[in-house]
Swiss-Prot record:
Task of the protein: A non-essential component of RNA polymerase (RNAP).
GO cellular component: DNA-directed RNA polymerase complex
The protein's assembly and partners: RNAP is composed of a core of 2 alpha, a beta and a beta' subunit. The core is associated with a delta subunit, and at least one of epsilon or omega. When a sigma factor is associated with the core the holoenzyme is formed, which can initiate transcription.
Organism encoding this protein: Geobacillus sp. (strain WCH70)
Annotated HAMAP family: RNApol_bact_RpoY
Gene from which this protein is expressed: rpoY
InterPro entries: RpoY
Similarity field: Belongs to the RNA polymerase subunit epsilon family.
Protein name, as recorded: DNA-directed RNA polymerase subunit epsilon
GO biological process, one term: DNA-templated transcription
Domain of life: Bacteria
Catalytic activity annotation: RNA(n) + a ribonucleoside 5'-triphosphate = RNA(n+1) + diphosphate
GO terms of molecular function: DNA binding; DNA-directed RNA polymerase activity
Keywords from the UniProt entry: DNA-directed RNA polymerase, Nucleotidyltransferase, Transcription, Transferase
Length: 69
């Protein structure tokens, strides 16, 4: 399953919506996503599972690239 992760690059700063970034990652569960990203310094705001029409919509985005970890 593909997950969309909303995050802030600097975990020491207060989250600001305008600085929120996203990445896409393949995993079996939200827990696995967190385990894969554990070594990265980021503040994870939300992990959203993508499937069906929502996944197809996201694939049309030119920035859609699944992170390989």
């Amino acid at each position: 399953m593909i997950f969309k992760v909303f995050y802030q690059e600097n975990p020491d700063e207060v989250p600001v919506r305008e600085k929120t970034k996203t990445l896409y990652i393949e995993a079996e569960s939200e827990r696995e996503v967190r385990q894969k990203l554990q070594g990265h310094t980021m503040n994870i705001e939300y992990i959203q599972p993508l499937e069906g029409a929502h996944l197809e919509y996201e694939k049309k985005n030119p920035d859609f690239k699944v992170l390989e970890i």
